[in-house]
Amino acid sequence: MIKIAFFDVDGTLLNIGSKELSDKTSFALKELRRNHVLLCMATGRGYLSVPHFEGIAFDVLLTFNGSYVKAGEKIIFKNPLEQDDKNRIIENLKNMNRAIAISNEHFIVTNGTDPDLEQYFAFGSETMKIAPDFDDLCDEDIYQIMCSCRKEEYEQILQGTNKTQITAWWDKAVDIIPLACGKGNAVNAVLAHYGFSKEEAIAFGDGKNDIEMLEAVGTGVAMENAKDEVKQRADAICKSVEEDGVYDYCVRNHLIAAMD
């Protein structure tokens, strides 16, 4: 019996760049909740950037790709970047002449801009805020660093760090988080918090940063619009986000009744 459902946001619940759920996706979430299934939003977005959908209350917010997780008002998991690693990454990116974004539960700011980073923010309907005091803010706890880059640059960005990893849902920008985080580890923390087994959980996702989440639950469902690498690691594949894949899967697998 499914007791909790984890959902990626962009490319899973929402079309990339969209702000509103489709009617069927909204219905599916409400029906799952009515059927006593807990809802967890599992996103690479920062805590301040999570979308809010009318009439839908998520029981858990898994943000920063799993670096900061809240169940209601209770923080059940948090793990900022280690100071030395954070400083080294920022130094590496400055040497590469990259604009850098940093974020925690209180702010999300940048030290500059470039087209790919702007598009990254635009996908989440966010505006980049360039902070004059960026270097001072870097001394705060930081859960995620974001920058534009390509896969062949990953090693250069992480050079000299010990406990960091790159996770990506787009091929032109990345999220840099602690090695001990990621959506999979955060899912495990959520399941432990509620006393649920892996088999009592289902997850939906489309990005490479969703793979470990899909593998951490009993049923990992990849969207049809996901990359092949994600589909190969999933237990099932549903229709695309444009075709209301979450709704269709939940109806076909008797998690909810169909809309009238």
Show the residue positions of the predicted features.
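Conserved acidic, metal-coordinating active-site core of Asp-based
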Residues: 92, 96-216, 225
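Short hydrophobic/aromatic-enriched beta-strand-loop microsegments
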Residues: 58-66, 122, 166-169, 221-224, ...
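Asp-based, Mg2+/Mn2+-dependent phosphohydrolase catalytic module
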Residues: 216, 221-260
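Asp-based phosphoryl-transfer active-site loop
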Residues: 3-18
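Non-catalytic pre-domain segments flanking phosphatase-related domains
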Residues: 1-7, 30, 34
